[in-house]
């Protein structure tokens, strides 16, 4: 391995990323990972996961569009239904393949070189998010596979959550993990109350810490995006949590009262 080899691969990865050639960007960063035996710089990591994010999110958006169209085709008993379903299944496989490739890189290469908690939190967030993405696109009948992935996602998220106390309340990796974990709880696990409580707690702690510190402008911008997403979710979820609490209260009122047996 020479410095020129590394510089050349990084240069090509940069060019590909700027040109929107995300498959090629991943390929060159993979080669860098091999040259360094799993080690990776912050820039290379950003190039790698930015490319995975673009490739995966583009297909997730396409999947949602086709899924909505498929519902219409089913309703209209269209002769094109098999083709539309075929497109959706192809997208499902593409998303799963990209995710499996990314997780394989994390588990087999990147995690072996991690020596700080922030990176461990980051990788646990990415793995948890990717499990959530697969759960979202699996058919309803794949209940067993979904349940297994829910357990895996919970496990991945909790690895990072257990390390969160070692990071500052204004650490964007920490806040990002907590934000995405609450989305997982709300949308996948249907645990509305816990999602709301964690989101609100994260929002309050972050806002309190912001007032106490002078932040770098770039950090402030990143943090501001996360805080606004938390705020939006808290606002959207509050009505559901309120309704759930009311339903629970009504159920308690309707339950039979305990009657003590009369003394003899």
Region spans (language model):
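Alpha-helical adaptor scaffolds
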Residues: 133, 137-173
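TPR/TPR-like (Sel1-like) alpha-helical repeat modules
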Residues: 33-34, 193-211
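Short coil/turn linkers that connect adjacent helices within long alpha-helical scaffolds
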Residues: 39, 111-115, 166-170, 208-214
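N-terminal alpha-helical interaction modules that lie
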Residues: 1-129, 133-139, 148, 159, ...
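Hydrophobic/aromatic-rich effector regions of fungal transcription factors
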Residues: 130-135, 177-189
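Amphipathic alpha-helical protein-interaction segments enriched in hydrophobic
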Residues: 119-126, 169-184, 219-232
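Short conserved catalytic/interaction loops centered on acidic-Pro-aromatic/His motifs
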Residues: 169-175, 188-198
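Alpha-helical repeat scaffolds
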Residues: 152, 194-202, 246-252
